[in-house]
Amino acid sequence: MNVFVDTSAFYAVMDADDEHHPAALPVWVDLLEGAHRLYTTSYVLVETLALLQSRIGMDCVRLFSADIQPLLQVFWVDEGTHRSAHHALLVAGRRDLSLVDCVSFEALRQLRLTEAFCFDAHFAEQGVQIMPEHLKGGIA
């Protein structure tokens, strides 16, 4: 199975104090043990590294870079994808929706992915099957 991984999931896996950590860890282990192909975007990587650096520190950034990043298939965002996502952001006109989210949705469409490991309700709004499934109604 091919699965998109969002910043919200990466952060929940990396930070034991995060409210979603208990739900994230078993999903992460299952994904790794199941030999699933894990996808993300270059924008999610930038967002994740910045978040880890500011909230946890550089040791966490190094750990993520050494142990998690090599496991990922990275969708490198080109100008066309950026423009499409930027347009989608402007059309949506919502303060709670980010450019990184819109880039992720565009990447999901281009990669024909239907499942995402995340704690972001915007993915479910896009018709994406999210993991952990039981959190569909209760994520931020």
Regions found by a protein language model. Name each.
Residues 10, 45, 82, 123-124:
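A generic structural signal for short hydrophobic patches within well-formed alpha-helices
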Residues 34-38, 71-73, 112-114:
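Short active-site oxyanion
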Residues 105, 110-140:
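Acidic, PIN/NYN-like endoribonuclease modules and their adjacent C-terminal/linker elements
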Residues 1-39, 53-63, 135-140:
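Short, well-structured N-terminal submotif of metal-dependent ribonuclease cores
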Residues 50-52, 59-76:
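Helix-adjacent hinge/juxtasegments
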Residues 6, 48, 108-109:
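Hydrophobic residues within well-ordered alpha-helices
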